[in-house]
């Protein structure tokens, strides 16, 4: 399996043989960190952690282009269904087995309002995703602050954690989270997209390695194969 970081919090999970492509939080248009020359493959599933524009992103456009199915909370799925998207609604704590693997929605401490014109629509509860694919456990935390809920996560092969501060955990809090999660590998996300979430990824890497956890810093467009 190949895990490709596409800037900000965008993650593409792909089967090496091309059997499936799953994208999380597809913020492409307007994302200054998105690799402009990257050729996105046909997307089978879109997973959305919450309703903010930098995560909901290009979901509707991708759905219409690829006939993708959206996996998200009940409220976001209902909103997207009205936009013509195929949906699979879930909620925090829920588990479902898809053709590509097992998905569980995990708690996240954040907001989820959907901005539409001059209105903010209710977007349900934000979440993270715990995904079991090809025998590997992948955790995408979404946008979240530090929470004791991290202690419930076990046997994580790769964790994608936000470190940018201001809206989410900063480096120090992300290291506390890392100590609770204890993944085999951690990849920092949601940082340096804009100055307001500027963070020192090398400081995070050094802290992770002191905990005995491998930290892989991916530039937008780079992949990790597991």
Curated annotation (Swiss-Prot):
HAMAP family: UPF0173
Name assigned to this protein: UPF0173 metal-dependent hydrolase Fnod_0635
Recorded family membership: Belongs to the UPF0173 family.
Keyword Hydrolase: yes
Record-level Gene Ontology MF annotations: hydrolase activity
Residue stretches spanning the membrane: none
Keyword Hydrolase attributed: yes
Native source organism of the sequence: Fervidobacterium nodosum (strain ATCC 35602 / DSM 5306 / Rt17-B1)
Superkingdom of origin organism: Bacteria
Keywords: Hydrolase
